[in-house]
């Protein structure tokens, strides 16, 4: 089954992406706690705005990091994990 890159990711209600100085990195805050994101996840998370589709997120990161092999597949994998963990919805 292939991933539909035309889908638009949105952070779920109650979840907030932000930079947390105490963690020295980006986190995802939610009612039960916090998830510290690694650098790659933070870059992807910063582009989730409820307006861009996954293809646009891939295109933007490809501009910032040209020639990175399998960039699109890595972003798709992040989206699948984030959806499975109920961090995002995909419209």
Curated annotation (Swiss-Prot):
Annotated InterPro entries: PQQD, PqqD_bac, PqqD_sf
UniProt keyword annotation of Lipoprotein present: no
Its biological purpose: Functions as a PqqA binding protein and presents PqqA to PqqE, in the pyrroloquinoline quinone (PQQ) biosynthetic pathway.
GO terms (BP aspect): pyrroloquinoline quinone biosynthetic process
Identification of the protein by name: PqqA binding protein
Organism: Pseudomonas fluorescens (strain SBW25)
GO MF: quinone binding
Coiled-coil segments: none
Pathway: Cofactor biosynthesis; pyrroloquinoline quinone biosynthesis
Pfam families to which the protein is assigned, alphabetical: PqqD
Keywords, alphabetical: PQQ biosynthesis
Superkingdom, natural source: Bacteria
């Amino acid at each position: 089954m292939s991933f539909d890159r035309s889908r638009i990711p949105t952070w779920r209600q109650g979840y907030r992406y932000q930079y947390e100085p105490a963690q020295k990195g980006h986190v995802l805050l939610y009612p039960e706690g916090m998830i510290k994101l690694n650098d790659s996840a933070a870059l992807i998370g910063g582009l989730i705005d409820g307006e861009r589709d996954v293809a646009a997120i891939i295109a933007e990161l490809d501009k910032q990091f040209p020639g990175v092999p399998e960039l699109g597949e890595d972003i798709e994998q992040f989206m699948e994990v984030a959806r499975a963990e109920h961090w995002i919805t995909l419209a």
